[in-house]
Amino acid sequence: MILYHGTTYKRAKQIFEDKVIKKDCERFFTEEENGDGYSTDGYVYLTNEVTFALHFAYCHHLVDKSEALVVFRIDIPDEQILPDYDEMRYQDPTGIDRERYDSDLNCSLFEFKTCRINTDISFDEYTVDYFCLDVDKVDNIGDLFDNAGCNYEYVTSHYTRKQKSFIKLIPWKRV
């Protein structure tokens, strides 16, 4: 499955140097800082929707003030993909959304557009592409992640013209 990982250029420099997206790293979203919205160590967090990866990269940019955003596109074998129980806990504390899906993974991917894997993503072992976006060169960057809080089906069927154009013109590069 093609999945995406969004981060800031400051963090991506280390990823490029190491040639790996690490499952154990310093987290932006910690229990101490974010309460229920924290990320568990030992996982690489991913999304099945490219503008959502950009949204997460932008949220991280607001913290570390990086000059650019980086989104990685990775081909992950289906058997490695796990539900993002952190996002499910945060977004669906009562479990109502989970009840509508036949599996936690489907709920995670199609309701919350997130998942995770419990291994590092080595550039030598996975097919990885990326693009870099200079934050200051995009007018109204928030327009690129319109409907970020909506489920996968809604987001992908309601892309704006700006989003469609952006997605079509992404200059993917192989790492």
Please name every model-derived segment.
Residues 50-64:
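Short active-site loop/helix that positions an aromatic residue
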Residues 12-13, 54, 81:
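Eukaryotic short linear interaction motifs
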Residues 68-175:
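Active-site and NAD+-binding cores of ADP-ribose-processing enzymes
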Residues 22, 35-45, 82, 108-116:
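Low-complexity, flexible helical/coil segments
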Residues 5-11, 48-50, 75-78:
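Short, flexible loop/turn elements at secondary-structure junctions
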